[in-house]
Amino acid sequence: MSEQIKANNSELPPVTQVGVVVRDIAKAVDYYSTTFGWGPFKISEFEMKGADYNGRKIDCKIKMARARQPGIEIELIQSLEGDTPYTDFLKEKGEGLHHLGIRVEDVGATLAKLSGQGIRPVFSLSYPEIGLAFAYLNSDSVGGVMIEIMQMRRKDNI
């Protein structure tokens, strides 16, 4: 017998992204492309300056590969420099599913609403000049997969 659980009043949008942490992005892109036909992947490097990670400011550099599939975006992430949630994830769990992402209109407003439920971000950064902001919400107590809320100026920012 199945049971249906009623959602709370957070009214968050559906998941639109699956984030996977990998050690070698080229190897992962090759695997997902040749094995499953996913892609094309757009590969980019990002320097994140002044990100908030567990209450402290950090600088780090990552490489990302992103591909769109019907209804979902696949994001592969490799940490290149610095102490990040990705390096900690690799140390604690190895490669694998890191986060499920949802797009919101306003990250700040969403965080304010979720804070009323005791939910706090563990990693966040904002680039107001390009209309990009994101925050990871820790869910180690249930399932261990982070939730990423992201705000982007354009609907498809790949």
Locations of regions flagged by a protein language model:
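N-terminal beta-strand motif that seeds the catalytic metal site of vicinal oxygen chelate
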Residues: 1-27, 95-104, 155-158
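A short, acidic/glycine-rich surface segment
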Residues: 3, 49-53, 84-87
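Core segments of cupin and vicinal oxygen chelate
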Residues: 10-13, 21-70, 109-135, 156
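Short, structured motif recognition centered on aromatic/hydrophobic residues
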Residues: 15-22, 32, 62, 72-77, ...
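Histidine- and/or cysteine-centered catalytic micro-motif in compact active-site loops
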Residues: 46, 79-81, 105
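Helix-adjacent hinge/juxtasegments
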Residues: 63-95
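Short, solvent-exposed interaction modules
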Residues: 90-99, 110-112, 116
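Acidic/histidine-enriched, glycine/proline-rich intrinsically disordered or flexible terminal extensions
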Residues: 146-158
